[in-house]
């Protein structure tokens, strides 16, 4: 019975090897291919199969996804025992010179003879579908972020600019009935003061929406201008450190960094009850990192956010638009540390 089962298993495995759409390759320790099924011939030719050329797999490989990059040859899976114990994504060049993504395994199946089995399953359609879904997801997040921004602008216009304009309108109407010249001059001066304040409010709102210096000069200049204005308006000191100098980044990245830092500072202003805020911007290798730290009230991350909660939500949404992440470390009475990390 055992012998019959063994024969049947051998037959099934052979049929699977011959008819599977999965590409199956057997190679020795030197990378020389000693056998492969028909499916694998989309990538490896008969010459690769029967020649004595070592590392034929390496010749067709365009890198695999690891901690270093999406397509990297560092810590090659042909040599790394850690990688060989897992499934991984690899990019192989087909015979018509197209680079395709595959889910792969590379396993030692005969230790005595040093024979490895290399299997490949094409995941092009799955990745394409994932990218479409990701684009749709990011589009929804973009629209959501835009709507939240519009709501914020609408609130600020209603609470400050429109209220002040209504005040000016009322006072101008009353001037028509003012017969006391001295009182008339006082009212006119008051209106002049309100209008000047309105101009400042609108100018500040314009800077918050999109500072010209961000487009023209980059993050460093935009932050220095914003921090100076912030200190003048609120009396809170900003301690700023940076190593980016005048380095320019992608426009979307600069916008996200500026907005997240701005939102973190405004949250500290509203809730932290502090006299100073530390802001750091640094480029470390292939990452841009921004930190906003205060030693204020802090909060319980598990509790419902104060206010609308759109600030923290918006920071995460913005970061995701450029494949970044926001980490918030805080405790009640121990301050808050907001860290933005963006790959560049």
Curated annotation (Swiss-Prot):
Post-translational modification: Autophosphorylated.
Residues modified to Phosphohistidine: 158
SMART domains referenced in this protein's UniProt entry, alphabetically: HATPase_c (SM00387)
Domain called Histidine kinase: residue spans: 152-344
Cofactor binding note from Swiss-Prot or TrEMBL: Binds 1 [4Fe-4S] cluster.
Catalytic activity entry: ATP + protein L-histidine = ADP + protein N-phospho-L-histidine
Entry superkingdom: Bacteria
Binding site for [4Fe-4S] cluster: 58, 61, 73, 76
Gene Ontology terms: cellular component: cytoplasm; membrane
Main subcellular location of this protein, as a coarse class: cytoplasm
Keyword Iron-sulfur tagged: yes
Enzyme Commission identifier(s): 2.7.13.3
GO molecular function: 4 iron, 4 sulfur cluster binding; ATP binding; iron ion binding; phosphorelay sensor kinase activity; protein dimerization activity
Cell location: Cytoplasm
Pfam families registered for this protein in UniProt: HATPase_c, HisKA_3
Cofactor: [4Fe-4S] cluster
Keywords noted in UniProt: 4Fe-4S, ATP-binding, Cytoplasm, Iron, Iron-sulfur, Kinase, Metal-binding, Nucleotide-binding, Phosphoprotein, Transferase, Two-component regulatory system
PANTHER family attached to this UniProt entry: NITRATE/NITRITE SENSOR PROTEIN NARX-RELATED, NITRATE_NITRITE SENSOR PROTEIN NARQ
Job description of the protein: Member of the two-component regulatory system NreB/NreC involved in the control of dissimilatory nitrate/nitrite reduction in response to oxygen. NreB functions as a direct oxygen sensor histidine kinase which is autophosphorylated, in the absence of oxygen, probably at the conserved histidine residue, and transfers its phosphate group probably to a conserved aspartate residue of NreC. NreB/NreC activates the expression of the nitrate (narGHJI) and nitrite (nir) reductase operons, as well as the putative nitrate transporter gene narT.
Name of this chain's protein: Oxygen sensor histidine kinase NreB
Lineage: Bacteria, Bacillati, Bacillota, Bacilli, Bacillales
